[in-house]
Amino acid sequence: MRLVFAGTPEPALPSLRRLIESPRHDVVAVLTRPDAAAGRRGKPRPSPVAQLALEHGIPLLRPDRPNSDEFVAELTELAPDCCAVVAYGALLSQRLLAVPRHGWINLHFSLLPAWRGAAPVQAAIAAGDTVTGATTFQIEPALDSGPVYGVVTETVRDTDTAGDLLERLSDSGAELLERTIDGIADGSLTAVPQPSEGITVAPKITVESARVRWDLPAHVVDRRIRAVTPNPGAWTMIGELRVKVGPVTVDQAAEADGPLAPGEIRVGRNSVHVGTGSHPVRLGQIQPPGKKLMNAADWARGARLEEPVSAS
């Protein structure tokens, strides 16, 4: 089939690679978001998907307004049989959805109808899900609500960050997307409506939602930090200093040195503990402003923290 691939960030790359390498399909163009400012100098940089397309000599489509009359006409001229989508980053109008005869097939990183929305991987980890997955479905105007072609499941590990889990789902999801496109091409796949029960929503992660709430139970603090690692990164205030924090370890044994109130920090010879709504957690890494991630105990010694000090 003639395919247009729509995607932007790094997790879309395994899917694009598989479709480029497939002998059954021809990726005639790649749709991605316009170049965005990156780095300290803010110089515009092509998206990861754009860079891969350029390496393979595939025409790039980077409209500022993908639902404009001009772009609808441009896509119509390409006459794609199907459009495959992985994290493109924009809502699509009904006119655009109607262009390819087999529609737009999206790879979503959850087991729909669970975790519809922008941050399904983060939501699954924060909620303590033990199993998640990826779903291919037909895009329709309502958010992530279209009929399902296929799913693949993935175990959520106790130490998974969003980055870890997304990397695995990107690989297994790419294989699922290729199988789905193959099945649509040969007529062996039929989409099944999503159930009306079990719908949950995963809204976009905001800077404020990534702030650590030390008043929550330790296991919840742990999950919520891992859910926003590496991006945008969990953060907290220590005095007047805003720092990012990496994944933590729940450490009930630290209570032997006395209780810690939520947010209260205890600096040991080789450790930094913070109180939560239940048990203390041990900080692994801290990233001060303008610096790289570093060992939390090393940072605390260098910062010469004087107790009592708290995170908030």
Curated annotation (Swiss-Prot):
<comment type="similarity">
    <text>Belongs to the Fmt family.</text>
</comment>
<dbReference type="InterPro" id="IPR036477">
    <property type="entry name" value="Formyl_transf_N_sf"/>
</dbReference>
<dbReference type="Pfam" id="PF00551">
    <property type="entry name" value="Formyl_trans_N"/>
</dbReference>
<dbReference type="InterPro" id="IPR002376">
    <property type="entry name" value="Formyl_transf_N"/>
</dbReference>
<dbReference type="InterPro" id="IPR005794">
    <property type="entry name" value="Fmt"/>
</dbReference>
<dbReference type="GO" id="GO:0005829">
    <property type="term" value="C:cytosol"/>
</dbReference>
<comment type="function">
    <text>Attaches a formyl group to the free amino group of methionyl-tRNA(fMet). The formyl group appears to play a dual role in the initiator identity of N-formylmethionyl-tRNA by promoting its recognition by IF2 and preventing the misappropriation of this tRNA by the elongation apparatus.</text>
</comment>
<dbReference type="Pfam" id="PF02911">
    <property type="entry name" value="Formyl_trans_C"/>
</dbReference>
<dbReference type="InterPro" id="IPR041711">
    <property type="entry name" value="Met-tRNA-FMT_N"/>
</dbReference>
<feature type="binding site">
    <location>
        <begin position="110"/>
        <end position="113"/>
    </location>
    <ligand>
        <name>(6S)-5,6,7,8-tetrahydrofolate</name>
    </ligand>
</feature>
<keyword id="KW-0808">Transferase</keyword>
<dbReference type="InterPro" id="IPR005793">
    <property type="entry name" value="Formyl_trans_C"/>
</dbReference>
<dbReference type="InterPro" id="IPR011034">
    <property type="entry name" value="Formyl_transferase-like_C_sf"/>
</dbReference>
<dbReference type="InterPro" id="IPR044135">
    <property type="entry name" value="Met-tRNA-FMT_C"/>
</dbReference>
<keyword id="KW-0648">Protein biosynthesis</keyword>
<protein>
    <recommendedName>
        <fullName>Methionyl-tRNA formyltransferase</fullName>
        <ecNumber>2.1.2.9</ecNumber>
    </recommendedName>
</protein>
<dbReference type="GO" id="GO:0004479">
    <property type="term" value="F:methionyl-tRNA formyltransferase activity"/>
</dbReference>
